[in-house]
Amino acid sequence: LSKAPVIYSHSSAKAIANHPRNVPDDVLKRIAVNRGVVMINFFSGFVVPESAEIMREMFHVRRGLMAKYPNSKKDVDREYKAWQLKNPFPAGEAKIIADHIDHVVKVAGIDCVGLGSDYDGITTIPKGMEDVSTYPLLTELMLQRGYSEEDIHKVLYKNVLRALKECERAAKKMSSQP
């Protein structure tokens, strides 16, 4: 087991959106013991339940196309793109991000959740969370759900900074051991 906090930098709660990249509750409980952080991703395919289902189907479609056209990436890409256009991800609403935060807090505690928006690598984002300028909406949603100012600061930055500092301490300790 890791002697340093584990950071899931771009994951969410699997109990809400069943995607393989998301973190199941049994692992969330271990994250709490490890003092790690699950940083909620904003990609609709990871956080919106219906979109996560489409993503799971999408993997199977892609594998099937690769078997159908083993020597033609062009054909795979063409049919895959057509399938994607017929099966768009529902974007969802900003509240789904707060739902994931709530779930991680419920299972692992307020010290184990952060934000891993992934704005530079995603295509579909819940409405209201289009870029970092929309964070005040998420802050407002958290206030409405009873989070304190300190809790919100933990989610926005304090938890991941704490975990990174603990990782640095663990690395120094391990590097000084024979």
Show the residue positions of the predicted features:
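Aromatic-lined glycan-binding groove of carbohydrate-active enzymes
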Residues: 24-80
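Solvent-exposed loop/turn segments at secondary-structure junctions
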Residues: 13-15, 44-47, 119-122, 159-162
